[in-house]
């Protein structure tokens, strides 16, 4: 049955305000101002431009023109990965079928991870992490393993980022505006040191991050599913030596990217006309987030 004319008029005018006595021109409601809708997607990690396009081209676009602007390739080698036991996987019976392309072979019933692929994926993950930290993005370390909780929290604190090593309630990312308010900002990158929880099930945050289009970096063992991880790093996630190596690499990469950002901003202030005229002025303080 077709709706009544009055009901149809209300449906067509939903979300639109009209001023009585003036021209019947629709004015967009609060949810449609500026052509954008209020969503729970994370805010881009690009800071507001300073001095127009010059700041954009010199500071923000320069790292994108180099394949390894932060020299993350020199932080590790295949030998260092081997010495940290990154190549050791689980038993062949626990193997996930999507991890088969990253497995080098099997020895005495234990899967061996191909370290050449691990080094390639690790370089891509560290490079992406450095670019996010360079643009002052929020990085969240996530793990559910109690054995490495203190190490992960210390790593996040050392590089000025955040960590979540306790129980992760489902909906913290998808319903963040309802739980924390409309002004909450979601992380720009989530680093999973373990993609499984205590009962060897996929971590809830992996699924929620995929729903919210939040990029993820994750250490995936031979019993993990790498499909929902944006930058999977095949490697051992149970050995203390391996986790210490990964934490050291992430901490060094983030600190290096932040230091590079401070150097680029200082160089830009010195080269700009305003900086040369007022050399006696105090430098602009770093407004990056602090945990």
From Swiss-Prot:
Pfam family, one: Ribosomal_S2
Record's keyword annotation contains Acetylation: no
Domain of life: Eukaryota
UniProt xrefs under InterPro entries: Ribosomal_uS2 (IPR001865), Ribosomal_uS2_bac/mit/plastid (IPR005706), Ribosomal_uS2_CS (IPR018130), Ribosomal_uS2_flav_dom_sf (IPR023591)
UniProt keyword list: Mitochondrion, Ribonucleoprotein, Ribosomal protein
Subcellular location: Mitochondrion
Renumbered residue ranges of the record's region Disordered: 27-52, 264-291
Gene Ontology annotations for the cellular component aspect, listed alphabetically: mitochondrial inner membrane; mitochondrial small ribosomal subunit; mitochondrion
Nucleotidyltransferase as UniProt keyword: no
Function field: Required for mitoribosome formation and stability, and mitochondrial translation.
Stated family: Belongs to the universal ribosomal protein uS2 family.
Protein name in UniProt: Small ribosomal subunit protein uS2m
Lineage of producing organism: Eukaryota, Metazoa, Chordata, Craniata, Vertebrata
Gene name for this UniProt entry: Mrps2
């Amino acid at each position: 049955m077709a709706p009544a004319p009055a009901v149809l008029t209300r449906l067509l005018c939903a979300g639109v305000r009209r001023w009585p006595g003036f021209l019947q021109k629709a004015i967009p409601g609060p949810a449609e101002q500026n052509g954008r809708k209020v969503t729970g997607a994370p805010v881009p990690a690009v800071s507001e431009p300073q001095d127009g396009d010059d700041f954009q081209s010199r500071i923000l676009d320069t790292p994108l023109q180099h394949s390894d602007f932060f020299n993350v390739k020199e932080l590790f080698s295949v030998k260092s990965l081997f010495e940290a036991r990154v190549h050791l996987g689980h038993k062949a019976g626990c193997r996930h079928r999507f991890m088969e392309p990253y497995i080098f072979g099997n020895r005495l019933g234990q899967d061996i991870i191909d370290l050449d692929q691990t080094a390639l994926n690790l370089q891509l993950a560290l490079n992406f992490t450095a670019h996010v930290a360079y643009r002052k993005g929020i990085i969240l370390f996530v793990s559910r393993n109690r054995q490495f909780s203190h190490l992960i929290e210390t790593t996040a604190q050392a590089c000025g980022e955040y960590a979540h090593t306790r129980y992760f309630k489902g909906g913290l990312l998808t319903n963040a505006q309802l739980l924390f308010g409309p002004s909450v900002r979601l992380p720009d990158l989530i680093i999973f040191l373990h993609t499984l929880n205590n009962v060897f099930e996929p971590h809830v945050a992996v699924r929620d991050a995929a729903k919210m289009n939040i990029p993820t970096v994750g250490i995936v063992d031979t019993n993990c599913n790498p499909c929902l991880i944006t930058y999977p790093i095949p490697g051992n996630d149970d050995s203390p030596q391996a986790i210490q190596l990964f934490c050291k690499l992430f901490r060094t990469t983030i600190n290096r990217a932040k230091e590079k950002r401070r150097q680029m901003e200082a160089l830009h202030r010195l080269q700009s006309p305003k900086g040369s005229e007022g050399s006696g002025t105090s430098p602009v303080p770093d407004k990056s987030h602090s945990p």
